[in-house]
Design a protein with these regions (language model features):
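Gly/Ser-rich catalytic/binding loops embedded in alpha/beta enzyme cores
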Residues: 1-94, 112, 193-196, 201
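Short acidic, glycine/serine/threonine-rich loops at helix termini
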Residues: 1-2, 41-46, 98-103, 120-121, ...
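Short Gly/Pro-enriched turn/cap motifs at secondary-structure boundaries
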Residues: 10-12, 66-70, 98, 122-124, ...
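Conserved active-site and cofactor/substrate-binding residues in soluble primary-metabolism enzymes
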Residues: 14, 18, 74, 91, ...
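Structural recognition of the beta-strand scaffold that forms the well-ordered cores
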Residues: 29-33, 86-90, 98, 107-108, ...
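Glycine/threonine-rich beta-strand-loop-alpha-helix active-site module
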Residues: 93-119
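A short helix-breaking turn/cap at a secondary-structure junction
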Residues: 110-194
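Short connector loops at secondary-structure junctions
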Residues: 203-217
């Protein structure tokens, strides 16, 4: 409701966001709100990742002031990684769920646009914004995602997504699956162990060097 900005400190919405209503209806306990990169990092260029005027600097629990938190859903990733909560909600326009999930070793999912309602979320792009679940493992992520889906008439992109299937989560095979691996991550010992494990299950892991992306001036 504030996007971490002092300008929004007195922004008190009249009703819960649709996804919060869904969680409460299913018995979830809402522990609170967490910090984020101010204005989802879009209107605060040059600000440290994970910093906001209202919340200060979010720190990575695996190495405070050593490792970045990722952003903009910095607090969501940190809260799950530090076991403050079993699950958290992030939002993403471009990388804001996936980045803090990777930096804090949690599971993050950016759903298809419209699968989750965006009502109540400070908007950046109507065609790119979405909320998404952030958890410690895939099963918890699927459970949270299942609780969040539903059509919201307040969001014109919203639709009734198909139910999440749980019956095959423990039987999915990696045999024959082709997975891309950014070559710059290959030196990391944990990544090497993960790659070895995936290959042992039949995955074809293909190393690649991604091209540099020319940023806007």
């Amino acid at each position: 409701t504030t996007a971490g900005a002092a300008a929004m400190v007195n922004n008190f919405p009249a009703q819960d966001a649709f996804i919060v209503e869904k969680l409460k209806a299913k018995g979830a306990l809402i522990l609170g709100k967490v910090n984020m990169s101010e204005w989802a990092y879009y209107f605060c260029q040059g600000c440290p990742v994970g910093y906001s005027a209202l919340g200060g600097q979010t720190l990575n629990p695996y190495g405070r002031r050593i490792f970045e938190t990722g952003g903009s859903s910095s607090g969501s990733g940190v809260a799950v990684a530090a076991n403050y909560a079993v699950a958290a909600i992030g939002s993403e326009t471009s990388g804001s769920i996936l980045s803090p999930s990777g930096k804090n070793s949690v599971v993050g999912l950016k759903p298809t646009i419209g699968a989750l309602s965006r009502s109540g979320i400070v908007p950046i792009s109507s065609s790119l914004d979405t909320a998404g679940p952030m958890t410690k493992n895939v099963i918890d992520n699927a459970i949270l995602m299942s609780a969040l889906i539903g059509e919201d008439k307040r969001d014109r992109y919203s639709y009734q997504a198909s139910p999440i299937r749980f019956d095959h989560l423990d039987t999915v095979s990696l045999k024959g699956k082709r997975l891309g691996l950014n070559s710059k991550f290959q030196k990391d010992s944990l990544m090497q162990r993960a790659v070895t494990a995936m290959k042992s299950k039949g995955a074809d892991v293909i190393s690649f060097d991604p091209p540099e992306i020319q940023m806007y001036p």
